[in-house]
Amino acid sequence: MTVKFPYIKNNVNPYRDNVQGKANEPICVAGLLDRSKQILGPEMKGVQPDWSLEEIYDRLHHNAPRIAIIGGSPDHPAHIMDFQTIARAAIRIWQNGGVPFQFSTPVMCDGTAQSNQGMSYSLQSRNAVAQMVVNQMEAHSYHGAFVIQGCDKQPLGVVSALAHLDRIRRHRGEAPFFATFAPAHVLKGGSIPSALFSELEEVACQAESHGAEDIALDLRDALSYILQCSSNTAFQGVLERARERGIISMEEHDVYEKKLAVATCDGQGGVCAFNGTGNSSRHLVAGMGLVHPALEMLTAPPTQEEVNQSIDSLASMINNPVFGTANIMAANIKNAIRIHSASGGSTNLMMHIVAAMLYGGYKFDLWDYDQIHHEVPIPDLFNYSLTQGRDIFALAMQCCSGKIRGMETLFHELMENGVPMDIAAPTVTGTTWEERLSRKQQLPAAGVPDNPVILSKPRRMFSGVDVIKGNFFESAVVKISGMTTDQLDNFDKKAAFVLFYDNEDSANESLLDEQLLDKLKANRSFHYKTMQAVLKQNDPERYELCREMEYDRLFDEMAAKGALKISVVVSGQGPEAFGMPEMFTPMQHINANRKLKRLATLISDGRYSGVTYGAAIGHMTPEAKNGGGILYLKTGDVLYLELRNRKIDFLDEEKFQQGLLEFNFEDTKLARQELGMERLLKIRQRQRLVAASNRMAGHTDAAHGVVPLEVAEDATLHYQTDIDVHALGENAWT
């Protein structure tokens, strides 16, 4: 049974007033519908095509809803099966009286671009996607969209575009823009073939026989994870170390990498099963009210019935300002942030949330996000694991089995744990959250008795991504959900030596060097008196026992007991300097090395992958290219980490050696102006590695979403007052 879409109540209709559109586009619509019928094959048996050019002309002329189906490029795993979903959506839009169109945007895969020049284009691609979508929607005068949501920068790029369109249409006095999002299904993580597993276990045994127990343990750690693109990087790092020590040959290394790679991805694609930016975006956009629950959490491409439910709901949204994309997003911003936090979402989304709000016309920044995040404690209700059968594919199976309801369940459990949620906010079902949650069946997390991903009882009473301040920078972020309580304890209120790099390549090379700690010791990279002070701060119980040790012995003792803390700083990676690439690989090399993992944090003005875990601090502002304090740091400087208090400060080293915690950076900055100028010159030279057409000059900083300045300047609305949550009658637009 179909529903009937109302005509668009809008005095503006280029297809009525300009004959060229009615001459050009009917063949495009007919072609799309013909292909859709062919793709769906037997499912269309008995359906007689009624999409004549004359009928298409009439619908265009009379302002039937023109709905763009926005897909992604099939060179990204999330979009391999778009053709099928496009076909289902096109047929249903036509059956309901609309006019379907289709276009796709390029979609960068951050995994494919990882650790190569492509990563400098990743963040910029979000704004490029937004621009391309706005261009196409405005040029062809589409009223709404059905979005096949993929991974990485595409989801929030399209959210930003459509919120921007809604705002500009409303400014021009036109009908509100409506949209619904359909996340690609979850890709099933790969399994290591049993024969390969045995081979790699043999490598671990060989490592033990060579006295390389650390490699054996790290390799077995990697073997405990589901197979995915990010775990391949962990294997790569451990196998390189094994090769350096003569445990395996280069040829064996290549064979292992090949066998792992080809076993990684399921042939139907989807969004990778880890809780990275792709699945974090799934949860976030659902929390924004923009995803129909029928399509939110699937293990396979959607059926026709599932697509129909989403598209049919558009009938109650069309012409209703409450259900304009920008209004839905802003009305749900607190819901979205609390779901993002409770589900351990990606740090990337800190920028993307801010950007989407700015594109939607709302004045918003990182500090607004932080205020919402800390208005009330947000418990950790996400028991996600890549080693214990609780990845996002497992969550999707729990939802598809009818035991729970995905983000509706998380929304419910947040309220049960005392978190205020905006239940009156509109969603793309054409109803509010309150109406959606009034159906209690399968709502509680207790519906999954065994190995649940969503919990009713919190793991911890805090979660999410924290904003950090310090005396040498204005803002940075750390994914507190990505750190265990033990890790927090390990680095909190600790003094850490800076190990400085001005580019990621140098950092990666160094972090893979088996002799890194020995070289730091041999080069006397850290001042002896400062090492004694660090020992006293970080391990006071051992201070009297160890403080008189000579340099080498003290270094070894502190490294062995974990008292030596190192902040690996990768500078010059900000959006303007180098496109803000992810520092996933250096952090992965730290995490895959049990010696370094106890000692090292990573600090950068770059980003991190959504799958990154551990003590990874990024998005530092101002970035090095803009004279931020990170530009002036040197190996051997000392930072004081207060992660629970959300602070990192530069220590006065001389006072620290005297047993005092005094924070002073300005004197150091003034003394290092010449060093800063030398580094800025190197940054400008290195910047030429990125195509000039795609550099992000004229953009806001990471705390303000990294959006074009014009977008930020036009964002003047208040996200709490300039929204509409009052339900309006059908066809409310006049």
Predicted regions span which residues?
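Small-residue-rich anion-binding loops in enzyme active sites
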Residues: 81-113
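N-terminal small/polar loop signature for handling phosphorylated ligands or for N-terminal nucleophile
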Residues: 103-140
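Catalytic or ion-coupling anion/metal-binding cores of large enzyme and transporter domains
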Residues: 1-75, 93-98, 102-104, 118, ...
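Glycine- and acidic-residue-enriched helix-capping/strand-helix junction motifs
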Residues: 76-86, 580-581
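Short acidic loop-to-helix transition motifs that present clustered carboxylates
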Residues: 108, 128-133, 153-154, 187, ...
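Short coil/turn segments at secondary-structure boundaries
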Residues: 77-81, 117-125, 150
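Internal mixed beta-strand/loop scaffold within catalytic domains of large alpha/beta enzymes
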Residues: 79-82, 138, 144
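A short, small-residue-rich loop immediately preceding and capping a beta-strand
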Residues: 69-70, 140-158, 181
